[in-house]
Swiss-Prot record:
Designated name of the protein: Probable E3 ubiquitin-protein ligase ARI10
Cofactor binding remark: Binds 4 Zn(2+) ions per subunit.
Acidic residues composition-biased segments: 1-18
Source organism per UniProt: Arabidopsis thaliana
Record's comment describing the protein's domains: Members of the RBR family are atypical E3 ligases. They interact with the E2 conjugating enzyme UBE2L3 and function like HECT-type E3 enzymes: they bind E2s via the first RING-type zinc finger, but require an obligate trans-thiolation step during the ubiquitin transfer, requiring a conserved active site Cys residue in the second RING-type zinc finger. The active site probably forms a thioester intermediate with ubiquitin taken from the active-site cysteine of the E2 before ultimately transferring it to a Lys residue on the substrate.
């Protein structure tokens, strides 16, 4: 492939672009998610071809305004991390300083005589003709073979190849894309331009790539109080920390929770809480039977009492009380591990339920939707309420999952009753909705002669449950985002709030078609 100054950044545009990041089109539930969850987007999803255009526009602008070649404009933009305004301000303030800093020389420091027949390469020290020699703005001569080896090595080393300098150790002249195009092979050239494209997103502060494997979209983020974004590939993530979307829990809590789940010290705590060291060899021993007469395994073989730790050779009784700091420590650890397990198991289970719901939605859209449409003699658009229900389930499972991480780190005991009440009501509502969508829908996949009345009742029930569940979770999310502020009210106001909420819940339950 030939590369010119005009199409210098077009190398990726000819590649096949999977705009949905490898996702299944029938499983792209993002548009509906936006309707249900996001009242107003504060971000823009940008496809790869759009990034190329933005990149090209910036290069054209800098080249035109500063009266530079595109090669030089690219060097400057890379140095300034694609911040055009900062580049222009500093260039017009002190052009000479900027040229020296980035390595764009006006005049060569080495003047190779154009009439000279034999020119010595500065790397291999062999003599070459003028056509076999190449140099950048500094003029240091190197044969094209050495240039190829030098630049290829830089490309193999990673994105640093975008800022390669002249091979001469004391020279600061930059190697432009014209040299890359001239001396590298196609596979290395393609790798270089891949780094070049990604630099437009990764070097800036307002864009990030979607972290979903295989997705080639980026997200440009605006001003917002929340960081959750939904990519075109259906993946939802936090723009701030790049983890899975975790509102209403903040990034710091998520980071601590994930680290705790991966921390090997939790295994050590389990050992401390559920075992005792052999009094002789100090190896931890777990008691698996009722008898307190313990025998250490392996080469030790020491026999001792599990209760008091004394050797059985001189053991008579251990009913006398002796202060045992280790026992107190084990009790505390057992309590903490039990507490952690409570929250962790529910965090995992809700994630598992969410993934199952996503799979069920995919199956419904790809297989069951047409079948249900035929059986009930209804157009697919009239069955959108089922898709909406599954989307609500998926989102609610995500929120509920992270509320368990929130609950684990909730140290304010005064706030815990309100938190657990709101969480419990939301979870109960979600279970009703999930059960209805997962189990009660099955009967309608069997064709019946007069399906209308029964199916219409199901539609009303599922639609009602979807709305009610959304209300529960909206209340839960709002409360957590506000730091459970209702607890700061007087006890009388808090009691009134809970009583009002319970009356509302009772009213809703009566209307839930149960």
């Amino acid at each position: 492939m030939d590369y010119s100054d005009d199409d210098m950044i077009d190398n990726e545009s000819g590649e096949e672009n999977n705009s949905d990041g490898g996702g299944n089109e029938s499983y792209n539930y993002n548009a509906a998610v936006d309707t249900i969850i996001l009242s107003e987007k504060s971000y823009v999803i940008i496809k790869e071809e759009e990034i190329l255009k933005l990149q090209r526009d910036d290069i054209e602008r800098v080249s035109t305004i500063l009266f530079l070649s595109q090669v030089e404009a690219i060097v400057l933009l890379l140095h300034y991390h694609w911040c055009v305004s900062k580049l222009e301000d500093e260039w017009f303030t002190d052009e000479e300083r900027i040229r020296k800093t980035v390595g764009i020389l006006k005049e060569p420091v080495v003047d190779v005589n154009g009439t000279e027949v034999d020119i010595q390469c500065g790397i291999c020290f062999e003599s070459y003709t003028r056509k076999e020699i190449a140099s950048v703005s500094c003029g240091h001569p190197y044969c094209k073979t050495c240039w190829t080896g030098y630049i290829t090595t830089k490309i193999e080393d990673g994105p640093g190849c975008l800022r390669v300098k002249c091979p001469e150790p004391s020279c600061y002249a930059v190697v432009g894309q014209d040299m890359i195009d001239e001396v590298t092979e196609k596979k290395d050239k393609d790798k270089y331009y891949r780094y070049f494209l990604r630099s437009y997103v990764e070097d800036g502060k307002k864009m990030k790539w979607c972290p979903s494997p295989g997705c080639e979209c980026a997200v440009e983020f605006g001003e917002s109080s929340g960081y959750d974004v939904a990519c075109l590939c259906s993946y939802r993530f936090c723009w701030n920390c790049s983890e899975d979307a975790h509102s209403p829990v903040d990034c710091e809590t998520v980071s601590k929770w994930i680290f705790k789940n991966q921390d090997e010290s939790e295994n050590k705590n389990w050992i401390l809480a559920n075992s005792k060291p052999c009094p002789k060899c100090k190896r931890p021993i777990e008691k698996s039977h009722g008898c307190n007469h313990m025998t250490c395994s392996a080469s030790c073989g020491h026999r001792f009492c599990w209760i008091c730790g004394k050797s059985y050779s001189d053991h008579y009784a251990c009913n006398n009380y002796v202060e045992d700091a280790d026992h107190d420590k084990r009790t505390l650890l057992q309590s903490e591990i039990k507490r952690y397990t409570h929250y962790y198991v529910r965090w995992v289970e809700n994630q598992s339920s969410r993934l199952k719901a996503m799979s069920d939605l995919e199956k419904f859209q790809s297989v069951q939707l047409k079948q249900l449409s035929d059986n009930q003699c209804k157009p697919k658009i009239d069955l959108q309420f089922i898709v909406d229900a599954w989307l609500q389930i998926i989102e609610c499972r995500r929120v509920l999952k992270w509320t368990y991480a929130y609950g684990y780190y909730l140290d304010n005991l005064a706030k815990r009753p309100l938190f657990e009440y709101l969480q419990g009501e939301a979870e109960t509502g979600l279970e009703r909705l999930h059960h209805c969508a997962e189990n009660e829908l099955k009967q309608f996949f069997i064709k019946s002669e007069d399906p209308s009345d029964t199916f219409n009742a199901f539609r009303m029930k599922l639609t009602g449950l979807t709305k009610v569940t959304k209300t529960y979770f909206d209340n839960l999310v709002k409360a957590l985002e506000n730091g459970l502020a209702d607890v700061t009210k007087s006890s009388e106001e808090s009691a009134d709030f809970l009583e009002t909420q319970k009356l509302y819940d009772a009213y809703i339950s009566e209307g839930c078609f149960f």
